[in-house]
Amino acid sequence: MRVLGIETSCDETGIAIYDDEKGLLANQLYSQVKLHADYGGVVPELASRDHVRKTVPLIQAALKESGLTAKEIDAVAYTAGPGLVGALLVGATVGRSLAFAWNVPAIPVHHMEGHLLAPMLEDNPPEFPFVALLVSGGHTQLISVTGIGQYALLGESIDDAAGEAFDKTAKLLGLDYPGGPMLSKMAAQGTAGRFVFPRPMTDRPGLDFSFSGLKTFAANTIRSNGDDEQTRADIARAFEDAVVDTLMIKCKRALDQTGFKRLVMAGGVSANRTLRAKLAEMMQKRRGEVFYARPEFCTDNGAMIAYAGMVRFKAGATADLGVSVLPRWPLAELPAA
């Protein structure tokens, strides 16, 4: 069984083909980073127009990479939400149209379920149950996962997502968009302890996050100190350490609350090396396991949509003839498979 996956929720056009026996057969990705760099962030209208230009050529490239023809595709999965409405509509329209033309089922996929299941693409996939840390530019959530579609929200950010805080703080430090990875690279040259940032909402019970205050603290620290390269690196180090520590503390609480021994980390920020190292160290001390996808599957991609579509297809999920998307779509609303 082979599923074509289409991802267009934001500023990456991702197309992949997944085979339930052979695994990933094709993976094509186009990033719009250069398109949005001059604006310091994603411009929704530009993102949608670029998806229109890139989606079909990437599908053709994926078919060529896999050596398959359209007749050998058994279903088409597409990201139906959450995300930018215009961008979502491009992928949904193309996906639904191809499914109709090829006479195969169309499978709407939840973007964050795609991220959550991305570690399943690895050679050592996690088993249920586990705590999932979904951490990206748009989401920071802790989820109790006991099966496909069996998701319970434990905590989430009440304001900025961790990835958004990374990008905004990077901009304050004079780094280009997207600044998160650049900030981490700068932080590696920083001196630990020169600046000490707060660990938001760790001084009280609960599993919710807040990162807007941390961004403000960073802005004040930047204004109050010199603009030399080492000072900027030290501030980046203090900021990254604060975010990583906060995420780690909340993960520890979630594991204590659920009693689970496995932690899954997914989303763009899960590619952060410092975060990976800290969580791996924490889970080793707890005699548990931590799982995450390879870096290219942490950010938005078609492979996770193709895989999640395969899982949902086997569970009987299909879409009607209409084209509909959900820019806001709580993960907990998904049905169990």
Swiss-Prot record:
Keywords: Acyltransferase, Cytoplasm, Iron, Metal-binding, Transferase, tRNA processing. Coiled coil: none annotated. Gene3D superfamilies: 3.30.420.40. GO terms for molecular function: iron ion binding; N(6)-L-threonylcarbamoyladenine synthase activity. One of its GO terms (biological process) is tRNA threonylcarbamoyladenosine modification. It catalyses: L-threonylcarbamoyladenylate + adenosine(37) in tRNA = N(6)-L-threonylcarbamoyladenosine(37) in tRNA + AMP + H(+). Its cofactor is Fe(2+). GO terms for cellular component: cytoplasm. Its EC number is 2.3.1.234. Binds 1 Fe(2+) ion per subunit. Fe cation binds at H111, H115, D300. InterPro entries: ATPase_NBD, Gcp-like_dom, KAE1/TsaD, Peptidase_M22_CS, TsaD. It is an enzyme of class 2 (transferase). CDD domains: ASKHA_NBD_TsaD-like. Pfam families: TsaD. It is found in: Cytoplasm. Substrate binds at L134, V135, S136, G137, G138, D167, G180, N272. Belongs to the KAE1 / TsaD family. Required for the formation of a threonylcarbamoyl group on adenosine at position 37 (t(6)A37) in tRNAs that read codons beginning with adenine. Is involved in the transfer of the threonylcarbamoyl moiety of threonylcarbamoyl-AMP (TC-AMP) to the N6 group of A37, together with TsaE and TsaB. TsaD likely plays a direct catalytic role in this reaction. This is tRNA N6-adenosine threonylcarbamoyltransferase. It comes from Citrobacter koseri (strain ATCC BAA-895 / CDC 4225-83 / SGSC4696).
